[in-house]
Amino acid sequence: MHNIFTPDTNKSSVSKSANEQQIEANLRTILTRLGIIGDTGSKDIITIVKYMCMHPESVDTMTVSELCSKFCDNPKSMEQRIRRTAFNGLVNLAHLGLDDYSNEIFVDYSSTLYNFEQVRKEMDCIRQKTVKHGNLKIRHFLTSLAFRCQNAQ
């Protein structure tokens, strides 16, 4: 009876955790499609992207190192794990593009999560047309992931 008359202050936290769970589910789907969900840095990516989605106003001016420093004592190692995992996603995406240029995953992510020119450069490297690998911008990758996770709801 007491619960009926007391104001429910937990509703916002429940909806926030439901929103957070939805963002994490969307993020895990994307990382699975890229083939990097099992990589060590995928946990770091999930942590940072969830934070970016929950605090969009404070993240705009922060660097990736500053973001990483919020979650661990050694932000450089976290940033390196994220970089390696994101690069593995780039390589997996390039392989998909080589196999089937019209692959749904390739079409969806080659120009949104990564710079398409860099995906092409990685495809050329795999074909051994060049020795230069594709580059990636971690900030762009994380921001694009956050955007896709928020708008996939």
Tell me what each language-model feature is.
Residues M1-N10:
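Short, charged amphipathic alpha-helical surface segments
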Residues T6, T32, I36, K50, ...:
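Generic surface-pattern signal
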Residues K11-S77, R81-I82, L90:
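C-terminal output/effector regions of signal-responsive regulators
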Residues G41, H55, V59-M62, S77, ...:
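Generic marker of "main functional regions" within proteins
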Residues T63-E117:
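Flexible loop/N-cap segments at domain edges
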Residues A94, L98-Q153:
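Charge-biased C-terminal accessory regions appended to nucleic-acid-, cytoskeletal NTPase
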